[in-house]
Amino acid sequence: VAALTWQEFPDCDQVIVEFATADGAPSIDPPTASSEFMRRVSVLRVRFGLEVTATALSDQLIDSALTERAYVVRGLDGQFFIDLHLANTAEARMTTQSSPGRLIVDLRSGGDPYPATPAVADLTVVVEPVPGLVSYPLTISGYSRHFEANVIARLRADGNPETQAVTTATDWTETWGEFTFDIPTGPEGRVELFVGQESPRDGSEEGVYLALEAGGPA
């Protein structure tokens, strides 16, 4: 992944992903790719095939009506994907172009409202869960750039001991690394979920906090 740019037109927004060869020359052909519209969390995910082995950028602010930011993530399978965080409801179409190789996402206003958005901090993005009703086991997924790729989840409720789980993301040096893990069981009722890291400087929590209503097993 060499670059990401965008354009605004009267009837749509266009996000363009450019690619380069290992020696830095523009790629002639685009990689294989597939897309998934995760409307529940206002994210359009574009997954790349085995041809994409590195990235020159990790994230990009996008100043357009329909898109807020793009994250380049190393997935759990080792392959890269880009998440486009959408600012407003949209319908999407993905196409590719050769000479030079590009991937183009056209976004047009429309569709149903998004129920939720990812929780975002400087080095942490939580895609699931979203604020509201949850059940156990509680699955936590997202991506991060924490020190040494460590990810901590802490579940807190008044009158209950803290529940903690830890995992390791797939990257932290080159780009964002995906993570997913479960908290098998925990307190019911109103709970607070922290996902992030302990600061390498002073040990304080750095990450996102979610207000949840926890029920029993699903």
Where are these regions (language model features)?
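Ser/Thr-rich low-complexity repeats and stalk/linker segments
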Residues: L123-T124, E128-A218
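Short linear recognition/processing motifs and adjacent strand/loop elements at protein termini
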Residues: V1-V125, L138-S141
